[in-house]
Amino acid sequence: MAKKILILTDPFDPPLFVPRINNLCKNLDKNKWEPHVFTEKVIDVNYNTTLYPLYQMPYYKSKNKLHWTYKWILNLLFQNKDIQLQKFIENNTNVEDYDLIFCSTFNLFPLTTARKLSTKYNKPLIIDLRDITEQWGKQVYFSHKISKFTKLNNFIYKQVEKLNIKRRNKTIIKANAITTISPWHHNFIQKINPNTHLIYNGYDANIFFPQQIKSNTFDITYTGRLIDLNFRNPNLLLEAIQQLHKENKITPDKVTIKWYIGNTQKDELSNLIKQYNIESYNNFFDFIPNNEIPNLLNKSSINLILTNKTTKEGPFGIMTTKFFEAIGVEKPVLCVRSDEDCLAQVIKETNAGLAATNVEEVKEFILYHYNQWQKHGYTHVDVKNKEQFSRQNQALIFEKIFNQVLE
């Protein structure tokens, strides 16, 4: 008989809809594991799946700012969202029937719910931390502004961070096992809970595989959110394109940068591009559905990953899913600027592409693959040991940890 897993996670919001959980549930051995997923419902997002039972709890009833602020404060002070989720779970399923509880989050919610259910029903608890507050170092990283005054915002956010870290650690300490997504995260969290395991983000090998698709233009492609241009910094690429254009080595009818970013930072990025006077090389698009991403990446000549150098002030251990999807299709990866840390190391070890530190490197990289595209109509790189990053392999690692905890 299959063992039942009660999975708690943060909301399924676009454009990715928590791919780590989706892929885990899809790739678990159905004869051994039966996942049931509980999360928060996102307003105006009608996400559902037939892969596993999915229960979504409405918490925010509308996008009204007053309503949102009230519910946010209520949750900050009393963790009301976790309280409501526990009631929602107990009203929709029998927790006694599950063999273990698994909670995956990028922040705090729903860790407290997971801990309380684990304690109440005496169930083993495994925590998957996809992001942690400390990875941002001294940077402030919140998506909502409470005040129009920056210093007041920063003060409030720092107090919230301290409270959230305290609440998070209360659960981490009690967990039977922890999983996380980068060597930096592993080393940091292991100091709190020694039974911590590294499981990178990855790619679905069933849909992200190489195809030799010829294209009429040499496309440098970026997909996903672009929240902060200081954190995800494209300057090395823009300067390289500017110089190559001035040197008459590329033209906008042959080379394009395609930004699939929706409206996130579109205006700010457009203004930055204008400073380099290379508007004709750039095209903007809305987010694309997940099922179209593999084909898009395969059509690309270079897949772009934006980050910045890791300093003693952060950020640390940022390993975007987009990188792993790019190596799945075996297209050249251009990472600008190199983090000179975890991501750069994996790029080097896998021969996936370039983690750039200067403009000349970027120019040389673009020209090399541009020449390959001119010869063949497509580009390709031989990625080393990419199978270790497949979602299928990750599911096997998760299953091993589940079994160890249940022994």
At which residue positions do the language-model features occur?
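N-terminal subdomain of nucleotide-sugar transferases
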Residues: 1-57, 177
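Short N-terminal targeting/anchoring amphipathic segment
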Residues: 89-110, 123-130
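Membrane-proximal helix-turn-helix segments that form the acceptor-binding/catalytic region
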Residues: 109, 116-120, 133-136, 148-178
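Acidic donor-binding loop of glycosyltransferase active sites
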Residues: 176, 297-316
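Carbohydrate-associated surface elements
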Residues: 181-184, 202
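Acidic anion/phosphate-binding donor-loop and adjacent secondary structure
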Residues: 203-217
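Nucleotide-activated donor-binding/catalytic signature segment of Leloir-type glycosyltransferases, i.e.
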Residues: 254-256, 261, 267-295
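A charged, aromatic-enriched C-terminal amphipathic alpha-helix characteristic of glycosyltransferases
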Residues: 357-362, 374-404
